Amino acid sequence: MSEMYSAPVTVLGAGSYGTALAIALARNGHKTYLWGHQPEKMAVLATERMNNAFLPDIAFPDALEIESDLVQAIAKAKDILIVVPSHVFADVLKQIKPLLSAHHRIMWATKGLERNTGRLLQTVAQEILGNQYPLAVLSGPTFAKELAQGLPTAIALSSTDSQFADEMQQRIHCAKAFRVYLNNDMIGVQLGGAIKNVIAIGAGISDGMGFGANARTALITRGLAEISRLGASLGANANTFMGMAGLGDLVLTCTDNQSRNRRFGLMLGQGKSAEEAMAEIGQVVEGFYNTKEAYLLAQTQGVEMPIVEQIYQMLFCGKNAHDVATSLLGRERKGE
């Protein structure tokens, strides 16, 4: 393996997905540093050599090292992979900005939009860091547990810098289990990963109400149409939404109960409140926050997104699930 591709990577974010990506990188033979914001919990990870809170019984590869000091974590690698909830993405960028050098390159696997603005995370990154650093985004149908277990997985990678994209593809890609597809549409890759969480809540609500497979499939299909319309308004490539970061991630998140967003929707459909559902899940439900941002972005762009709008009405305006279903089913007849 060449020195370029065996260069270390620092992963910021020691939740389930950040840990899984760190494991995958280290399993490929790359020195990988995993940082989290709670030193006492990182000390436990370092001692136990696994993340029992999120990925129990999956041992860390030898190449994975825990680093609880952010200054050291940034200094030890030129390539930084951010895997934190979207609502703290900007805060992490502000933390690392004074620690960055000219050689650093920034990638993220965070899926979401900026809180209260609906802006893409690329826009946030460029506003905070400027345009001097190569940026990349990793997105697609990936559940952390399966990735950490080494089960076959495929994902999309998009970057502002073709060399960065090529190098990270070779670094992450594993012929046995982890396939990485390059995509030059950063807007579409980011958008697909963010809005699918909202649609997954809708699919969960539908299933929680007992509406069945037909209704779930209709929601997925029309949800994809909404994502595609919003993407077109922002200049995304329509083909992106038929790929890993679009249809792939949408189907996975809407149909499997490993998805927190789907489980959250299921509980809502069964009559639980948003607060009760989130407490039971016990982890961040990105779609809850992204619903408001997706609705705001759709309003700003003048794009009709009835599924997103109805989920927004339910989560933030007190509309009940039965009225949401009635509103969607009672819409004016139209062509597909």
Swiss-Prot record:
Top enzyme class: oxidoreductase
GO BP annotations listed: carbohydrate metabolic process; glycerol-3-phosphate biosynthetic process; glycerol-3-phosphate catabolic process; glycerophospholipid biosynthetic process
Binding sites annotated in the UniProt record for NADPH: S16, Y17, H37, K111, A144, R260, V284, E286
InterPro entries membership: 6-PGluconate_DH-like_C_sf (IPR008927), 6PGD_dom2 (IPR013328), G3P_DH_NAD-dep (IPR006168), G3P_DH_NAD-dep_C (IPR006109), G3P_DH_NAD-dep_N (IPR011128), NAD(P)-bd_dom_sf (IPR036291)
EC number: 1.1.1.94
Pathway entry: Membrane lipid metabolism; glycerophospholipid metabolism
GO cellular component: cytosol
Subcellular compartments: Cytoplasm
Keywords carried by this UniProt record: Cytoplasm, Lipid biosynthesis, Lipid metabolism, NAD, NADP, Nucleotide-binding, Oxidoreductase, Phospholipid biosynthesis, Phospholipid metabolism
Active site: K196 (proton acceptor)
GO molecular function: glycerol-3-phosphate dehydrogenase [NAD(P)+] activity; NAD binding
Residues that, per the record, bind sn-glycerol 3-phosphate: K111, G140, T142, K196, D249, S259, R260, N261
Reaction it catalyzes: sn-glycerol 3-phosphate + NAD(+) = dihydroxyacetone phosphate + NADH + H(+); sn-glycerol 3-phosphate + NADP(+) = dihydroxyacetone phosphate + NADPH + H(+)
Primary residence: cytoplasm
Record's function text: Catalyzes the reduction of the glycolytic intermediate dihydroxyacetone phosphate (DHAP) to sn-glycerol 3-phosphate (G3P), the key precursor for phospholipid synthesis.
PANTHER family documented for this protein: GLYCEROL-3-PHOSPHATE DEHYDROGENASE, GLYCEROL-3-PHOSPHATE DEHYDROGENASE [NAD(+)] 2, CHLOROPLASTIC
Family (UniProt): Belongs to the NAD-dependent glycerol-3-phosphate dehydrogenase family.
Protein name: Glycerol-3-phosphate dehydrogenase [NAD(P)+]
